């Protein structure tokens, strides 16, 4: 599907149907955490107009398997909402996913409030210009994201 999409031959209905099937499967298999190992949940969001949340669902499921609690803000999360949750919950890590460059604006990272303890800011997806996001860590895959988050919570 991804290769066809890159060639401009992708059928949007196939992509959307497969995405919904995968998200449903990830939600069904997500473990209900009764005693998470982190006292402050990790924040997962897609900034700007980003609608592609499948990576967030996969990360949330992988973290649940590790007994790590998350706040899942999902698609199209405005910077004002991200900032409010960061101030209110002081997450140990913030993971932001951007598929499109128009959503991977490096200014989002610097616009997050400065709090103590400072959360580890993690960026995933092809939409980020890594060289412009010096204050964040770019993660290359699901295992890398889980490893960085596990370190951030001190586990």
Residue ranges and their predicted role:
Residues 1-30, 34:
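Long amphipathic alpha-helical segments
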Residues 40-43:
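Conserved hydrophobic helix-helix packing surfaces used for dimerization/oligomerization
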Residues 57-72:
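Short helix-loop-beta junction
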Residues 78-82:
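Short acidic active-site motifs
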Residues 86, 90-91:
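Proline-aspartate-enriched helix->loop->beta-strand connector
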Residues 98-99, 125-126:
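Short secondary-structure boundary segments
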Residues 118-125:
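Short, hydrophobic beta-strand segments that form beta-sheet elements in well-ordered domains
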Residues 126-155:
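Peripheral docking tails and interdomain loops at the edges
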């Amino acid at each position: 599907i991804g290769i066809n999409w890159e060639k401009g031959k992708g059928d949007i209905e196939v992509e959307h149907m497969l995405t919904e099937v995968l998200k449903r499967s990830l939600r069904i298999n997500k473990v209900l955490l009764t005693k998470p190992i982190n006292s402050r949940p990790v924040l997962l969001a897609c900034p700007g107009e980003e609608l592609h949340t499948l990576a967030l669902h996969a990360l949330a499921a992988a973290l649940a398997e590790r007994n790590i609690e998350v706040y899942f803000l999902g698609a199209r999360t405005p910077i004002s909402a991200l900032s409010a949750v960061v101030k209110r919950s002081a997450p140990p890590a913030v993971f932001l996913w951007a598929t499109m460059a128009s959503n991977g604006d490096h200014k989002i990272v610097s616009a997050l409030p400065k709090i103590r303890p400072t959360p580890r800011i993690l960026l995933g997806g092809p939409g980020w210009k890594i060289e412009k996001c010096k204050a964040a860590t770019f993660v290359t895959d699901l295992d890398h994201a889980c490893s960085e988050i596990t370190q951030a919570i001190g586990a």
